[in-house]
């Protein structure tokens, strides 16, 4: 479950940075399933779902426990240098949608997904003890055309950034 650390009124769906200058916050890992593979035992932590159901229908299990809905996570990678986790969130054209698409709307824009009808995606950075119960996060990229106000490129000058859309896979080089 994730929360932003900026006042809700500063997140209006336009993608404009909040006053603190970053899309960031904290979160709490929610346990869905535990396993003891040596003894071939698995335990569900989701009421009304077996361990097998949690393993197969993970998104539904996460919804049942109130986990944060994300904008189509496509890849998760750990930096071999910093141990930070990076998540490519491809897009979600229905976030904050109105009219005919409102019924498909996952939820309104939030600090972890600050753009209405997010057509270009995001890249999130997660740090702290990944075996722990809590974490901190920030949006490294709010993708799109750098000429648009609703983009953010980790603090880099937008004039020096090419358009980025729908991040899919992440990789690290030796640098």
Give the predicted meaning of each segment.
Residues 1-175:
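Sequence/structural signature of beta-propeller domains
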């Amino acid at each position: 479950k994730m929360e932003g650390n900026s006042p809700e009124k500063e997140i209006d769906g336009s993608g404009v940075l909040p006053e603190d200058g970053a899309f960031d916050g904290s979160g709490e890992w929610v346990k869905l399933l535990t396993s003891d593979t040596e003894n071939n035992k698995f335990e569900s932590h989701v009421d009304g779902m077996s361990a097998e159901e949690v393993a197969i229908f993970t998104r539904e299990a996460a919804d049942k426990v109130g986990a944060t809905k994300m904008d189509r996570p496509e890849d998760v990678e750990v930096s071999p240098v910093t141990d930070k986790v990076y998540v490519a969130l491809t897009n979600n054209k229905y976030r904050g949608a109105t009219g005919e698409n409102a019924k498909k709307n996952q939820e309104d824009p939030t600090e972890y997904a600050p753009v209405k009808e997010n057509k270009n995606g995001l890249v999130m950075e997660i740090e702290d003890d990944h075996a722990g119960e809590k974490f901190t996060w920030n949006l490294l990229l709010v993708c799109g055309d750098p000429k648009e106000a609703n983009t953010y490129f980790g603090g880099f000058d937008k004039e020096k950034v090419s358009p980025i859309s729908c991040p899919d896979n992440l990789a690290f080089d030796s640098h």
